[in-house]
A protein has these predicted regions:
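N-terminal Sec-pathway targeting helices
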Residues: 4-25
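Non-catalytic tandem-repeat scaffold regions and their flanking low-complexity/translocation tails
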Residues: 10, 35-243
């Protein structure tokens, strides 16, 4: 009798463990489905109207933009009849505008006069007074983990909250009201005739006539005196051997 009870107990334990494994597996399937079922990127790309070669699409009287990592996100508040993208040879398909605002991805900026708006080059945009840099590479709002992304997506799916956005195109307003021109020798750089800017940040004490990229040193620049890493002025000076 005792052996039968022990045998039955072992069977119950095995059945419980097996049930738990099956339940966990089903939970993973549900989480995976919930996490990815809300993305309608493929549907919009296949059935929507793309604006040239840009990242913007029109679909069912709404405008969407491709934000890498998040898929296609709605651009809210767009005046569709006046909505335009920039027709340039640069890879700046993540920026557009209408009669009211400029859109860096799906983020609107309202202090640029779109009647005077022009593309400077090197990912800079200006109306002659206000100027912005907008990167073509996305950044995250926070340190992301698969767990945090799934939790946010599950809340969106279950409670119909606004679709969570984890990535954005970083942009920066320049501290100048002068007209900009791009710096040919430096990627992501522009000048107002006095100052040099990299990714929207001022290169302190940079000489606009001698600054250049250091060969085989990504993101490092030097003028006749100073050396920079991106927009940071480094503590050592140019010894004249940097090329």
């Amino acid at each position: 009798m005792k052996m039968n009870n022990q045998k039955n107990a072992n069977i119950m334990i095995k059945a419980t463990v097996l049930s738990a494994i099956i339940l966990i597996f089903l939970c993973f399937i549900v989480i995976f489905y919930v996490a990815f079922s809300g993305d309608n990127t493929s549907e919009i790309q296949e059935n929507g109207e793309r604006y040239g070669t840009s990242d913007f699409y029109r679909y069912k009287d709404k405008i969407y933009v491709l934000v890498y990592g998040d898929g296609l996100l709605e651009v809210e508040g767009v005046d569709i009849p006046t909505f335009k993208v920039f027709d340039t040879e640069d890879n700046n398909g993540n920026v557009a505008y209408d009669k009211n605002r400029v859109y860096f991805g799906n983020i609107a900026v309202s202090d640029l006069d779109t009647n005077k708006l022009y593309y400077v080059g090197n990912n800079y945009y200006s109306d002659g007074t206000n100027s912005y840099f907008c990167s073509t590479s996305v950044e995250t709002y926070e340190e992301l983990s698969a767990r945090s992304i799934n939790i946010k997506n599950i809340f969106h799916f279950l409670f119909k909250t606004k679709r969570p956005q984890h990535y954005f195109y970083p942009y920066k307003k320049l501290e100048t009201n002068k007209r900009l021109e791009k710096v040919e020798e430096l990627k992501n750089s522009a000048t107002d005739g006095e100052e040099v800017y990299y990714a929207g940040e001022k290169l302190v004490n940079a000489d606009i006539y001698t600054i250049k990229t250091i060969e085989d040193a990504l993101f490092y620049f030097a003028d006749k005196e100073n050396v920079y890493y991106k927009s940071k002025l480094l503590s050592f000076k140019n010894n004249g051997k940097l090329k």
